[in-house]
UniProtKB/Swiss-Prot annotation:
The lineage of its organism: Bacteria, Pseudomonadati, Pseudomonadota, Betaproteobacteria, Burkholderiales. Disulfide bonds: none annotated. This is DNA ligase. InterPro entries: BRCT_dom, BRCT_dom_sf, DisA/LigA_HHH, DNA_ligase, DNA_ligase_AS, DNA_ligase_CS, DNAligase_adenylation, DNAligase_N. Residues 610-691 form the BRCT domain. Zn(2+) binds at C425, C428, C443, C449. Its EC number is 6.5.1.2. It comes from the Bacteria. It is an enzyme of class 6 (ligase). GO terms for cellular component: cytosol. The keyword DNA damage applies. GO terms for biological process: DNA repair; DNA replication.
Amino acid sequence: MARTQAEPPASQPDARAAWLRDQLERANYAYYVLDQPDLPDAEYDRLFGELQQLETDHPDLVTPDSPTQRVGGEVAGGFTPVVHDAPMLSLNNGFADEDIAAFDKRVADALGKTTDLAGSVTDPVEYACELKFDGLAISLRYEHGVFVQASTRGDGTTGEDVTENVRTIRSIPLKLKGAHVPALLDVRGEVLMFKRDFARLNERQRAAEQREFANPRNAAAGSLRQLDPKITAQRPLSFFAYGIGVLDGMPMPDTHSALLDWYESFGLPVNRERAVVYGADGLLGFFRKVGEKRESLPYDIDGVVYKVNRRDEQDRLGFVSRAPRFALAHKFPAQEALTRLVAIDVQVGRTGAITPVARLEPVFVGGATVTNATLHNEDEVRRKDIRIGDTVIVRRAGDVIPEVVGALLDRRPDDAAEFVMPTECPVCGSKIERLPDEAIARCTGGLFCPAQRKQALWHFAQRRALDIDGLGEKIIDQLVELNLVRTPADLFNLGFATLAELDRFAEKSAQNLLDSLEKAKHTTLARFIYGLGIRHVGESTAKDLAKHFGSLTPIMDASIEELLEVNDVGPIVAESIHQFFAEEHNRTVIEQLRAPGKVTWAEGPPAPRAPQGVLAGKTVVLTGTLPNLTRDAAKEMLEAAGAKVAGSVSKKTDYVVAGADAGSKLAKAEELGIPVLDEDGLHQLLEGNTP
């Protein structure tokens, strides 16, 4: 949404008010009609508050179409307009503790509450406290207990008829429970989407290669306002009732809390996170309690709502033009804010992932000052069209890493610069590469890069790699932080005195680790390849590489075409292997590991062409305990005969070899009609005889 009008200074109140009205109306249209909000809530509130203050200071600036004189947005095309029997008003906002104290004082004074000599209220106001949901407000109309119509808030006076869409929301009863129901009931509440449902919806959107929703609020609004109710029916929407418009045929409950209990008796969904409290202290206590559990709630909220509980006191307090005097929304610190992006750097993760990071002018958001925010990856920067120098929307929720949501294109300076992914790692100078079909670019210096050092050492020491017993994460942390080990090759230079000085590392532990390192010097080529931590190269692929090439040097020098000849190595894996060995830093570390007195293994000639016997190319599954063969021995014999040993039974399985205590794999094989062999049958196959 373009905002091209120049921003006038505060010294020109007429022009400033006109500019503020324009900004707010454009934001309202994007939010309520397009369902594509482009202005953070905090920025909207700031502009709205400034306009309110201007109009208070200069009453002649108030216009009938000012956003301060209305509630919501225009009615969009495509839906039938609905005039509300009672206006759907919004709420005034409070942010600081002082705002809440001032609200309580205004209410207490208006109700004539008694005070002591110190000015403290001796008869505090009773309030009902609820959550402020981040969804879409709607009105539900029931006639004689039967649901007949649903409408959106719209501009507060006229909304949109979304009856057929709301019928698809399963938590909304189409008929109220109980024998005694009002002749007419206008229920006010919020349509929202739970966090888990939002995550599942976006998973489906990704699978269908459709646009993902930015947040649960956008998803709920977009789903409710679909022209096709069948689409709405596929969206996991929920509803909570929290207010009332009109009531006919039954007396109104005496308190707001009683109204919500009454709703529950009718089968309407009402949120249980609510309380009745007294005075400003009670309000602030509820706010803090909710704030502590906010992130663990299954839905998004952006604050809490306070309402004078007694209905007769609500009536005495009445309304102002756009909001009730008896209620206030106490909003949490903004989770989104505007600031300027001054630079884009890249960070290197422990697995080599290169992440663009926005360097920001400091901004207070989500309860903390933020100067850095993630941009996720190069594609995200391009998709969001974020450039250096832009005014950007920054989001921070709870403990989540701050992120840049988008840029305000109308505020883009002429010299805004596009982000260019560097070609070399900023930490170690190795090449940065990006595999086909992957969103993440990576540093290829896995064995050398300091940013990947701990991960490389941990992987190298794994049981299925060099099997260095006693080299756990805490020991690795100390070795790296004390600069005693930079690459896996340095492990074999460690001495007893150095290890014995490590924190909480006794002499016996030091000797055990040295013994384990000595043992690790004698390994296999497959274990060594796996221990290098090449992306996409697991234990099975490492074995295939070792078997195919016979020695390490041919693997290091192999072309992508030669790598593709290896069993189960596809284009992505071949590219990853080739990139790893093409990086000179990695080759240097490997040569250090192969130096005299370091790591050795038995090498042999390249594997002959694949066997042509009855097992060549067959898939075999082992299950249970064989009388004379261990599972590893059986696996080696099968692989030597050209078979592939799989871990699970499927329609592609050719044989299942079952021993004692065979379980679900045997049952699955029998169900699929796959031949089942015992140990004798296995030997017959290995000898070339079909069973």
